[in-house]
Amino acid sequence: MHIFEIDRLEQIVGKDRVREEEPLAKHTTFRIGGPAKWFVEPDSAEQLAACIKYLEEVQMQWYILGNGSNLLVADEGYDGVILSLHRMNKEAGQVGELHQIRILPADASETEKVAVLEEYGVKQCISTVKAYVSAGAGVMLSTLAARIADQGLAGFEFAGGIPGTLGGAVTMNAGAYGGEIKDVIVAAKMIDRTGKIHLF
């Protein structure tokens, strides 16, 4: 077993995105909960995968936090590493990969559709996909629903009022008003405990 060194996580995500004893009450919708021993904010799938791989190697407990919706945290906090997906660099006007939204409209060329669907290994869906939306795990469902509606697309309205992130919604198959994530998802990237990224 290796010894946990916070410097390794700082090398992966940057020193400014690692905090010690961060109050989790600031990151949950109920505004309760003690501090996380370490609070880390990756902004790409690669950074998240590298963090998970390292934490598994040193056998440090970790938890992925999206929007913190309906999450209860004990007053004692969390004696491990919280990997938060809720980071957005507003000062620089940049959006990290985990918060990006890409919409390929229905009038996109067949070549564009094939290229995008091949990226996710689902080229066989080309005949059934009218429009394509790709979004990171940290994207708020309300934001995604609004962006999709702004493009004149339908089918994701059910998620507009769900107070969570896309990553959490996929994990638990969130739904409302007769719609569910399983009804609209074509493919997903998943990071396993060894830090490998898979397409499903």
Regions found by a protein language model. Give the residues of each.
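FAD-binding subdomain of flavoenzyme oxidoreductases
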Residues: A154-A159, L166-F200
